[in-house]
Amino acid sequence: MTESEIVEDGRCRFDNEDLAQHRRTMRKSSDQTVADKPFHTPMLQAEPGQDILEGKKFFVVRGFMKSGTNWLCRLLNLHPDISCAGEFHWQNIAGPFVSNLDNSNLFNQKTGLRHEMWMRMDRMMKECMVLANHPDATWIGDRTPAHIAPSVVMDARIFNLIRDGRDVLVSRTYHFFNYPTVFPKFAEMPENKRRLREFKLDSHFFIKNPDELLGCTEFVEESAHYWAEAIELDDKATKDLPDERVLRVFYEDLHRDIAQQRKRLYEFLEVDPDQAAELSFNTEPGFEKEIPNRFLRKGAIGDWKNYMTPAAMDSFLKHAGDTMEQLGYET
């Protein structure tokens, strides 16, 4: 089989040449072990009786899916005092736990029991975060693309990442074409079935046929609705929290002035920005080459201009136009 032939990887088909280039890029620099340090360090080995939370502080990275939370996490990991890993999805555990507390007569009638139960749940989550992250870091983080509320990690500082909803839509659509089992309804939408077959055969199908990517009106409208709803919920949650707990970060600002934005990130956690490592190939804005069938595909701003037809734009703005305007995006 030659490199130009198409092979099957269990999700969709990809060009071997693209995959080989991706692997070469990932090997370019050992600096990737800095940005991804939770993966490259041994687990903390606690001594008997040791409190592994002692001296640790906590933060979370939140934002709608495909808003760049992975990149933000890697930027934070360039600082020796910070370690961020994902995705814990604590809300999926804490939500049912809190509901159980609320619905139990025992927890509500026995004075102080509900509070003590929640304190122990919070400690369990934080201990898991410490074990998953770099043992020498002071600031321990969880990167999960989710809403700010409920803020299940008590007293954690919050990075709220926001990205142009149109670029989110493009990235999200590519993501579901690459991983259709993540959202089965997507692959079952009649407009997407043919496109999925085409994409499996040629990973550059949408680059060659850009008007096809956002051709499913139902998915465009659903995505616009969910994105706008997430922004609204996060805005409300932010207003209910002290200013020092939340830092709003725009994806586009990271691209345009990454030096100043990195300074903001580190200063929010009260660490010295000058101690952070230099940017490397996997933390600089964007990628050297677009690889349509990779999780980290392009990392660009304004990519929606390549794919959004007038019909898709109308469908998107119908559900998210007001939110785009409130955030200051030109429409």
Question: Which positions does each model-derived feature cover?
Answer:
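PAPS-dependent sulfotransferase catalytic core
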Residues: M1-V130, H134, Y174, N178-V182, M189-I207, E278-T323, ...
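Residue-level preference for the first positions of well-ordered beta-strands
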Residues: F58-V60, T138-G141, V246-L247
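Short, flexible helix/strand-to-coil boundary loops that buttress conserved ligand/catalytic motifs
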Residues: G86, L169-T173, M308, G328
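Soluble or luminal CAZymes and related metallo-dependent hydrolases
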Residues: E116-M124, I140-R143, G215, F219-A230, ...
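Glycine-rich phosphate-binding loop used to anchor ATP phosphates in small-molecule kinases
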Residues: E127-A149
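PAPS-dependent sulfotransferase catalytic domain
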Residues: P145-A276, R294-F295
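C-terminal alpha-helix
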Residues: F268, T323-Q326
